[in-house]
């Protein structure tokens, strides 16, 4: 029985060997046929290369068991002495991307007439006392009117708000030039045409006031503010009754009303994110994503479904500093955006990021790039001082500083809201009109404080950085840091509250002796001289060594 089994096994093995021999013979025959074909091609066309076979591109290997594909428009199959060209249906055709047409900015514009604005808008500017555009306005207005998505970067107080409001008002609303608008009057009244998002209530209210000034008392209802701290029901009723063309608000309140179905923004043509570097923080992320999904659609983006009734929106990002996070957001949310600065307009694709996207820890180049943009955000006509004081004497130092510089409008910064009331109480006890502003104040209280501060009824406004972000008080001539900012970027945001629109401004940092090294570190990072000063006999006195630096 064992012998019979062995015999059968040998017979099967012999048959299998014969089968393998036949397979190898067929493969060899096929190989020699192809070799003869290649030799024939070589004799007729010279040397045998990939180019001679119309395969000029390099081969690319795929996974095991898959045929080798060539990165070209056609794949050549050889066999049976014939050549057949087969088109690769899965091959993607990459179109050459045309560079965005950049409008030459009018840096030498001496009047708003040169920017091509409607006559009605020019009359409003003249009525409000605006005669000469700033550098950033001369650069931004033509670019936005041309239809470019834009990132506007300029130092604090350079007129960035008007830089985007003017082109928007020239396209929509009662001041728009009729020949530019492609929408009927009924569409304008039923759909929101522009949305402006700000990180704080103060900045949102400030933008609304600027729009109302330009629109005038007759058309002021064409803009509606949607900010937190106010009655939501009244805001929804105002939306339904007034049918505004422009909405200005904070991310949370806008997203809240949008979820309730009371905010119709599919026909929105303009989306502005002011102080976008702050809006990119984690606590705004969910609301910002909802706004981006419901406010029009990105220009150049295809429809998500079979029918997409959303209008193409023009996206404008605004900030005094443009770190890599802003550049990344602009490329994701916009279509071929341009970077608008006070002296140039360039495609954002040409701006080199300072660090890779996935960098979890800031590198030296990333930190240097952020510091560089911070320096650019500072108003040019600022003087920076620091003085040493014990913690319990800081309020007296603040009072002596105000008297020595004869300051009329002062903003004093602290890091925590709970300490503001104590500082205000001590200043009031010493006969200096002051008030506090923080997040716990309601909308009415904050509006009242800001109005009194701008009118001069309040000399010192004590606040924290978040509440004062975007605060625009052109008359502010002194900023005092009663507590040190966390870094150079926060210092720049505080310092930007003074020296606005080319005015002179002073920044004084009050620190303890153990904190001087922090001031020196910020001085080195910003590349600006921080002069040590003292207040003697009602005057600000600078040491002889620092006087040499001034000269």
From Swiss-Prot:
Protein name per UniProt: DEAD-box ATP-dependent RNA helicase 47, mitochondrial
Keyword Ribosomal protein: no
Motif DEAD box: positions: 274-277
EC number: 3.6.4.13
Xref: CDD domains: DEADc, SF2_C_DEAD
Alphabetized SMART domains for the sequence: DEXDc, HELICc
Keywords from the named record: ATP-binding, Helicase, Hydrolase, Mitochondrion, Nucleotide-binding, RNA-binding, Transit peptide
Main location: mitochondrion
Species for this entry: Arabidopsis thaliana
Family named by the database record: Belongs to the DEAD box helicase family.
